[in-house]
Amino acid sequence: MKLPISQRLLACCDYVSPGAVVADVGCDHGYLSIHLLETGLARQVYASDIRPGPLDSAVKNANKYGVSQHISFYLSDGVQALPRDFDTLVCAGMGADVMISILEKAPWLRDERYRLILQCQSKTPMLRRYLSQTGWTIRREQVLRDGRFLYTVLEAFWGPGEPLTPGQCYVSPALLSGKAPLLPEYIAWVRDHLGLSVNHKSNPDPWETEAYQELCALEEGL
């Protein structure tokens, strides 16, 4: 039977190295976990959710698709209840504030053994800024369309990197280097939304203003 998995989740799976031990935090119905095991990308998955309902659904789906022997389920706030022997943390479909809270509550993740795969639903510049300021380096990032909307998926490693400028918090160097077909559309969309904020305030935020100026210059150079 065909797994009803979204393009956003498939894009997250593309960044998982074969044979990984994955923590799928905010697993919802478990589709990402199931796909990783069906395709052999993960050899073990720790699936967690803070809500009992979605977690129960994930358990049922794992049994339905025959992969339950390789998934352990946890009712957990972020990674708090999970074993620490995974190597890849996937968070998909959350806002930046939730992802940042998860990372802040688990300082032990700041270790080279872990990598993050993050698909942010809102306030993505806030997430990029946080990662840059706390020692994470965005190694890869891609933009994709799922339905009517554009999303990004990023991969981050713990370790030193060049601090992001305000504009790079909106369009990261990793995203630019990928040269995805949707990149110009994404940059224009981000610039338009940021412009609404900057141009309609009597006292615009200096950080947002600098970011907007960077994005306008970036568009001119494309």
Residue ranges and their predicted role:
Residues K105-E155:
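C-terminal substrate-binding/active-site "lid" region of AdoMet-derived donor-dependent transferases
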Residues Q44-D49:
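Conserved SAM-binding motif I beta-strand of class I
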Residues G159-P160, P166-L222:
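An accessory alpha-helical subdomain
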Residues D56-R84:
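S-adenosyl-L-methionine
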Residues G19-D28:
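Conserved class I S-adenosyl-L-methionine
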Residues R51-G53:
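Conserved SAM/SAH-binding beta-strand->alpha-helix loop
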Residues L3-G19:
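Conserved alpha-helix/loop element of class I SAM-dependent methyltransferases that forms part
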